[in-house]
């Protein structure tokens, strides 16, 4: 709000909105962290969020008990979001969230993540992606082998993976009344196929 000194009235400044991308996927991540805690506490599975490797460069110490990181850099590209053990099998997966209603953009899946998925599949791991289509409030689990083959076959002529493909080759994941994204029954079916 701008007010002139001689009382000529008030002029409202237009409010500008800032678009931020830092919290994309935070709802799904929070839900999965909650779900994984639920699984761990009930001795169902041990799945953890992988920390992002950073190199701290500058720290401000306003008080001894309140250090604030002022500058940090990613050490190297991270792999996937989650890993752990279930029924004696190594589990590794990525969580992806989009507002799109019909597809998931390739740009949100990084080459180093795809390479990591291939390496884990080669070693016999259970590897998948959990997609959350927030506009539709729908969750799907897609085995990484389907994601990898779709991207390899379509990278030149498509920019996204259609929701119809995810529905065809993946499985829906229910959100329970307790806010648990219950993906373990789908993982059971993946393990049983081995």
Roles of regions detected by a PLM:
Residues 80-101:
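Conserved catalytic cores of phosphodiester-cleaving nucleases, focusing on short active-site segments
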Residues 141-164:
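Short, electropositive alpha-helical surface patch
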Residues 56-57, 100-103, 137-138:
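Short, solvent-exposed loop/turn segments at secondary-structure junctions
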Residues 65-69, 75-79, 109-117:
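Short acidic (Asp/Glu) patches
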Residues 118-149:
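Nucleic-acid nuclease catalytic cores
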Residues 96-123:
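Mg2+/Mn2+-dependent nuclease catalytic core
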Residues 2-11, 15-19, 165-194:
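Charged phosphate-binding loop/patch that engages nucleotide di/tri-phosphates or the phosphate backbone
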Residues 10-70:
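Acidic-basic catalytic patches of nuclease active cores, encompassing PD-(D/E)XK
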């Amino acid at each position: 709000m701008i007010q002139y000194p001689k009382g000529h009235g008030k002029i409202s400044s237009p409010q500008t909105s800032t678009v931020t991308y830092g919290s994309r996927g935070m709802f799904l991540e929070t839900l999965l962290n909650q779900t994984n805690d639920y699984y761990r506490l009930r001795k169902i599975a041990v799945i953890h969020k992988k920390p992002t490797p950073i190199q701290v460069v500058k720290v401000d110490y306003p008080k001894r008990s309140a250090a604030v990181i002022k500058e940090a850099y990613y050490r190297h590209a991270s792999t996937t979001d989650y890993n752990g053990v279930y029924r004696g099998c190594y589990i590794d997966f990525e969580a992806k969230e989009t507002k799109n209603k019909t597809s998931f953009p390739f740009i949100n899946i990084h080459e180093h993540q795809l390479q990591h998925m291939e390496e884990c599949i080669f070693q016999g791991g259970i590897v998948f992606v959990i997609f959350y289509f927030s506009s539709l409030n729908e969750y799907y689990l897609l085995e990484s082998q389907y994601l990898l083959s779709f991207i390899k076959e379509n990278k030149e002529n498509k920019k996204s993976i259609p929701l119809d493909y995810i529905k065809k080759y993946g499985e829906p994941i229910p959100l329970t009344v307790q806010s648990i994204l219950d993906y373990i029954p789908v993982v059971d079916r993946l393990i049983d196929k081995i």
